[in-house]
Amino acid sequence: MTENRIILHCGFIKSASTSLQYELVKSNKNFIGFDPSCKNDKFYSDDELANFFEQVVRFADCSIYNKSYKKIQKRLDQILLQSENDMIISNENLLGKIYPFDLPNRIKIQRFTSVLPNNSVILIIIRDLKELFYSWYKNLVSIGYSENYLYFINEIKIMDKYMSYFDSFNLQKIIHEIKNYRPDLKIEICSIDNKKNFNKILKRNRLPCIKSIKNKGLQFSNYQDSLELNKNKIRGLRFLDWIDIHRIFTNLKINENIKYQHSRLRRHHAKEIQKQHLIHSFSEDKLNFFNNLPKKIEKISMINKVIYDKQV
């Protein structure tokens, strides 16, 4: 009889996470969350685990973590003991310094590995970092960011200078930290840039395959139109003061009016852009975005690819 395990999917952002989460919702696995469909008006089926993985791991001070982690250990053991299948937790924000107020990887890794049983699996999904940052920028624009890509790139350069932002996506350093705290844990790495092996790795870990592993992202006719809309609706929203309120501060589904006010609903943008009947191409903007990214990002991306290729 195969022993049930906890599989923790913990990164990267903008790397087919939502596609995987939707497949997990449909599967027979004991999927705790994050559930993008927000079934029963909740992103997680367990409030204690939601609070720990969404808030305590990423943002809380040491006193809050020290009070909670043993309770979470017992809770995970309890759920796993009662489960007929593997237990899956998916939160792509656990790796990488997504926002300025995210704790460093070292602390987040220490926290989330400290509560996992011995036979647990860490699943990391990677992609080319230039594509990741471009997709992340478009995502921010879709929910209210009001500056062009050059301003955004300057902001992440500032974050890198003071917070080692780019290295928070360095797979070599991430694996080192995981092994430092929990050498017993199994680490599996998928890449959405390698379609051939992506589902093979999921399958060998008893996870559902993804029909399309392309990161869907939001397709606006032109991001300039979205920026103009943002500037008219919200004045001066920038990355360094950005708060993604619906993920950080609650496990409950927020009232639509509050989301509209604070997070800039995606579908609202889509409707507004459609009204403008503008047809443009992202290709030129994307090339300019890539050309202005620091070379360090490409170097880290190459390191990640080498590590992934060795595993495969």
Which functions belong to the PLM regions below?
Residues T2-V312:
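Anion-recognition interface
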